[in-house]
Amino acid sequence: MTMDIYGGVYTFFSEIFFPNGHKFTYCKDIRISFTKPNKGYRTLIIDKVAAEYINGELPQDFDFVMSWLGNVLYPLNIEISPTGTPKSIVNFNEVWKRYSDEGQRIMAHYEQAPLIVQYVETCLERVRDEKLFLQHIGQSNIYQLMVLCMDISGHSYQLSDFPFTRNSLTFQFVIEDENETELLLTVPEIKTERKLLSHESRAYVHKTGMGTFDHIQFILIVELEGDGYYTRRLELKRIKE
């Protein structure tokens, strides 16, 4: 089973439900496209096309700074293997120039806010090293969703900062059911340092019928002893233009 993501504009949506009933949501629209293969490799092009929303509102305060700096990364051209492994940033010099210039502007604007300056400096260090930056991209939820169906059985999905910050869950999807238009996946086992009492998962993929997909949705519920249930929902859905 191998499928590429269908080119176009997509909405990326992320949501976390906590045991106390609180939730956190994040969404943004991006454009996704591929170049033709060259020696087996292709370039995945990701470009931002709309504003981000956090809990249904435009980013404020520190979130605004994170959004401001993060948006400068686009367009991002990533050379990938046939199985979806990121190999290099084709336009790395261009990306770094934009990112470092904007980072300096932000630090100058917020020079009296040491936490913001420290955050920007940390981000600059991460992006300056292409290998470290490439690793960060490869572990991002949005990238992992894009390339998941290129090698379902071979991909190990890493879900970071869940159920808590600096926690990480690693797992693989298996195909539970399939027909001409849909693919249903599940997660039989999760690897993590945190003890989970139970977990429930399901993923839905909509096929276009042309060896591509244009919608993927994943829901994971984990139970922690003494805490209760944490739910994570991720979705990447094409917008009809």
Regions found by a protein language model. Give the residues of each.
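Acidic, serine/threonine-rich low-complexity disordered tracts
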Residues: 1-80, 144-241
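A glycine-biased structural micro-motif
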Residues: 66-81, 85, 92-97, 101-104
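Solvent-exposed helix/loop surface patches that form functional interfaces
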Residues: 87-184
